[in-house]
Amino acid sequence: MSTKNRDRLVVTEDSDDDNEHEEMSSGDNSGEEGPSYGDAAARDPDETVAFPAPQRKKKKVIKKLTRKEQSLKHSVKEYRIKLAMVKPDITTDREKERNLRRIATKGVVQLFNAVSDRQKTMSDAVKEKMTARDRKEARERFDGKNFDSDKFADSGYGYGGKNEVKGEEEDEQMNIGDDEIDAGNYSDED
């Protein structure tokens, strides 16, 4: 094989433009699609192949914010705080959380008391000696579809008008009593 018919590539180290240092001689490959082992063996062993130096990665430039950008960022943060888009902090709102827990507990107690009273009246009505027709009417009367929420509120389970409006003195007295009760039964570790 002669060197005239083969392609030759010469690359020098630290080359910026690959086209400057490449030498291509076009020749007939005699139908071969790619280089073969014979071509590699026929090369001059003293021939050196140099590769270009790897390009260095650019360091990320940390952009320092201008005063205008800083003030804009601060105003956006304040706006989010105004919109209550901040996670609640239990340590600062401990009193508020305790009041909400107490209200929820009262609501659940009222609900269970109402359910037990309803079950009691229903079982009393069913225990009476009745005809089949009277039992059917009693079941329809105690059906959930016929439940009267006004009657529920009047029976003392719902919130009345006088419970919603409280004086500050009455509220303070209630907080003192709740603290004494809660101290023995509950812990704030949940």
Swiss-Prot record:
<feature type="compositionally biased region" description="Basic residues">
    <location>
        <begin position="55"/>
        <end position="66"/>
    </location>
</feature>
<feature type="region of interest" description="Disordered">
    <location>
        <begin position="119"/>
        <end position="190"/>
    </location>
</feature>
<feature type="compositionally biased region" description="Acidic residues">
    <location>
        <begin position="167"/>
        <end position="190"/>
    </location>
</feature>
<protein>
    <recommendedName>
        <fullName>RRP15-like protein</fullName>
    </recommendedName>
</protein>
<feature type="compositionally biased region" description="Basic and acidic residues">
    <location>
        <begin position="1"/>
        <end position="11"/>
    </location>
</feature>
<feature type="coiled-coil region">
    <location>
        <begin position="59"/>
        <end position="84"/>
    </location>
</feature>
<dbReference type="InterPro" id="IPR012459">
    <property type="entry name" value="Rrp15"/>
</dbReference>
<dbReference type="GO" id="GO:0030687">
    <property type="term" value="C:preribosome, large subunit precursor"/>
</dbReference>
<feature type="region of interest" description="Disordered">
    <location>
        <begin position="1"/>
        <end position="69"/>
    </location>
</feature>
<feature type="compositionally biased region" description="Basic and acidic residues">
    <location>
        <begin position="119"/>
        <end position="153"/>
    </location>
</feature>
<comment type="similarity">
    <text>Belongs to the RRP15 family.</text>
</comment>
<dbReference type="GO" id="GO:0000470">
    <property type="term" value="P:maturation of LSU-rRNA"/>
</dbReference>
<dbReference type="GO" id="GO:0000460">
    <property type="term" value="P:maturation of 5.8S rRNA"/>
</dbReference>
<dbReference type="Pfam" id="PF07890">
    <property type="entry name" value="Rrp15p"/>
</dbReference>
<keyword id="KW-0175">Coiled coil</keyword>
